Amino acid sequence: MNIMDFNVKKLAADAGTFLSRAVQFTEEKLGQAEKTELDAHLENLLSKAECTKIWTEKIMKQTEVLLQPNPNARIEEFVYEKLDRKAPSRINNPELLGQYMIDAGTEFGPGTAYGNALIKCGETQKRIGTADRELIQTSALNFLTPLRNFIEGDYKTIAKERKLLQNKRLDLDAAKTRLKKAKAAETKSSSEQELRITQSEFDRQAEITRLLLEGISSTHAHHLRCLNDFVEAQMTYYAQCYQYMLDLQKQLGSFPSNYLSNNNQTSGTPVPYALSNAIGPSAQASTGSLVITCPSNLNDLKESSNNRKARVLYDYDAANSTELSLLADEVITVFSVVGMDSDWLMGERGNQKGKVPITYLELLN
């Protein structure tokens, strides 16, 4: 029974305090009561903490979007994190693309130029997928986790103490108001005692809040180190991807797009990257087409009408019916035709005949 009486009294006291704060807050808003202002230093610290919280949240959320663009995947990871369980490993986009390329290359045949290239590209895409996974893991651990710890830990503590300071300030101003309204000596003495207590509690809470807020500078320093870790992780990722693509380009013998054949023109010749390097300064780009000084053995052929055997260096798909498609390593017969563009020869394979680009050929003795 005594416990029940105590609980009722406590509930009544809490209700009275809440009502007193509500009245004080309302009168302040209406301009009917004075408000104790916080000192400028404390106000600046509060503003700095609020600003830090807002921008930290924005940076954290956008970094999550950058690392995982799929919103469904982010929600799934969030749920598993709240359940304190590890999210199942899922294949990422580069890895999926890589697998499709490898499967396609296997289907087309690893022995064909296109199939072999697809397999090599697929393997590179898988390496990029692995690098992407490592970037996400490193960034989450070294950058996102510290930011989230601040939002969900340090700032929540600051917000709690700030709210408590606001309540102590309302209690203090309510006590000041009651003292002003007190007329009887006994009531005035009681109000003065209450004011001293509320002032002491307010000062104590202001000091606690100030000490917490001064830790924001340390938070900034910590987040700076985390930012450097994030930049280093990105630098490693992009350097890896660049190296993977550079290696792939070398494997494929890739060449710049302006060296590709123009299907709408017959005056230009596609030049493989490796061959253009071998030719060197003799290759010059002009008005979208490529003019090449032919190797001496091809010049000899142009000056004669004799047929010669030539080995095909690279696969070539005919752009139209006047051209002849080629397969790497096959041997065909070639000869010159009066009036034909200098970058082309006439090729013959059995009953098939058509123009072929000279840069795809190696004349045989």
Swiss-Prot record:
Tissue and organ distribution: Isoform 1 is widely expressed. Isoform 2 is brain-specific. Isoform 3 is predominantly expressed in testis, but it is also detected in liver and, at much lower levels, in skin, stomach and ovary.
GO molecular function: fatty acid binding; lysophosphatidic acid acyltransferase activity; phosphatidylinositol 3-kinase activator activity; protein homodimerization activity
Keywords: Acetylation, Apoptosis, Coiled coil, Cytoplasm, Cytoplasmic vesicle, Golgi apparatus, Lipid-binding, Membrane, Mitochondrion, Mitochondrion outer membrane, Phosphoprotein, SH3 domain
Stretches for region Required for membrane binding: 1-37
SUPFAM superfamilies linked: BAR/IMD domain-like, SH3-domain
Coiled coil: 155-186
Post-translation changes: Phosphorylated at Thr-145 by CDK5; this phosphorylation is required for autophagy induction in starved neurons and facilitates homodimerization.
Residues carrying N-acetylmethionine: M1
Name the UniProt record assigns to this protein: Endophilin-B1
Source organism of this protein record: Mus musculus (Mouse)
Source organism phylogeny: Eukaryota, Metazoa, Chordata, Craniata, Vertebrata
Gene from which this protein is expressed: Sh3glb1
